């Protein structure tokens, strides 16, 4: 239907009113993705109005939005964050009333109707997609886009924001090399990723980390220590560990949630706990570096800008064709619609038996298993 696929280059002659919503943790390329949707709609629909629902689902619940114009999407391709704000609204609380007893799901449906929306375009990660699917089940027209630096959304090979975060985490590891070598220290670089290790795995390989610890492969502390001692025996004065914030030892994986929480309270994070254990067993000097939220910030890398533009254009095509209830994903470098019901509630984790793990081990990276 769009001019991209029509020989006459004409526009569709009907009104579309679309609401944009960004939810969950921010990341690079949110703005670039919204721009891709908006520019395609403006280019191919005669009469389109876009509103920005402010601060994620909170705006949809409490009725906060602003009208957006083509000018609002100018110059944001390289801008990090989100021009309409975001917030975290846990899915498990969505069906519970707020502190004033208001039915949140009913409120979202009412505002959708009140604003006379034809469709919601929702950008977010796992929790966001659960709520988006809930809204689909409630009869709202929804198209979603896969946002997360964790790259753990089911149904897509890649999420926007991931590659930009890989670049930042890799740079942190790169910059540690010289100081680690100069002082002969063991450095732990803690990378974001509570449940999955895609970011740590890619940054660890790209940054030349000696040891990579991810949630999907519980580690044996003694094997981590052995890997460090082996490097020392080989005359290598330093070691660098890339550790996911959700990494866990085999011993701790056996603990109850209560006992694990109690143990973790003694340390700021997993890296500090692991660092203390390594220092005790090796006698080496340990330093911890936590890039933290810098991994979410800054300008999106060129790769993210490209896939965001492509994803956005295809999302707009679905809206024009009135094909709702889909996430727009990437499969074998092609942009494809994936039924939202097949995505919500599922996580794409690193397979410990996958080729990338085997290849990393082949070059000598230790995973502590």
Predicted segment positions?
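Short, acidic/small-residue loops that bind anionic groups at enzyme active sites
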Residues: 45, 135-159, 214-220
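Short glycine/serine/threonine-rich phosphate/pyrophosphate-binding segments
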Residues: 26-37, 60-61, 105-106, 117-133, ...
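Accessory alpha-helical/coil subdomains and C-terminal extensions
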Residues: 111, 122-124, 130-134, 162-183, ...
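A glycine- and small-aliphatic-rich helix-loop capping segment at beta-alpha/alpha-beta transitions
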Residues: 35-44, 67-72, 134-144, 160-164, ...
């Amino acid at each position: 239907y769009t001019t991209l696929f029509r020989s006459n280059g004409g526009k569709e002659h009907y009104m579309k009113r679309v609401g944009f919503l960004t939810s969950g943790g921010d990341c690079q390329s949110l703005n670039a993705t919204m721009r891709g949707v908006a520019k395609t709609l403006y280019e191919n629909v005669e009469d389109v109005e876009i509103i920005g629902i402010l601060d994620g689902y909170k705006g949809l619940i409490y009725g906060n939005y602003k009208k957006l114009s083509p000018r609002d999407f100018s110059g944001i391709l390289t801008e990090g964050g989100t021009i309409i704000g975001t917030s975290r609204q846990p899915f498990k609380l969505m069906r519970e009333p707020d502190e004033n007893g208001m039915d949140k799901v009913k409120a979202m449906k009412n505002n959708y109707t009140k604003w006379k929306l034809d469709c919601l375009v929702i950008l977010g990660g796992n929790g966001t997609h659960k709520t988006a699917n809930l809204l689909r089940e409630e009869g709202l027209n929804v198209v979603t886009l896969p946002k997360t630096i964790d790259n753990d959304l089911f149904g897509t090979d890649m999420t926007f924001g991931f590659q930009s975060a890989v670049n930042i985490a890799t740079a942190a590891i790169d910059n540690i090399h010289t100081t680690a070598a100069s002082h002969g220290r063991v450095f732990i670089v803690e990378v974001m990723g509570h449940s999955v290790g895609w970011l740590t795995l890619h940054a660890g390989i790209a940054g030349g980390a000696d040891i990579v610890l991810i949630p999907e492969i519980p580690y044996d502390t003694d094997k981590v220590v052995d890997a460090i001692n082996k490097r020392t025996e080989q005359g290598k004065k330093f070691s660098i560990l890339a550790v996911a914030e959700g990494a866990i030892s085999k011993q701790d994986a056996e603990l109850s949630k209560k006992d694990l929480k109690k143990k973790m309270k003694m340390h700021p994070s997993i890296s500090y706990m692991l660092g203390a254990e390594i220092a005790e067993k090796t006698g080496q000097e340990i330093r911890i570096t936590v890039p933290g939220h810098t991994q979410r910030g800054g300008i999106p890398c060129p790769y993210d800008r490209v896939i965001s533009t492509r994803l956005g254009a295809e999302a707009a095509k679905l809206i024009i064709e009135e094909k709702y209830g889909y996430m727009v994903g990437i499969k074998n470098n092609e942009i494809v619609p994936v039924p939202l019901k097949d995505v919500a509630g599922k996580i794409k984790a690193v397979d410990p038996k996958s080729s990338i793990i085997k290849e990393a081990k082949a070059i000598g990276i230790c995973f502590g298993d």
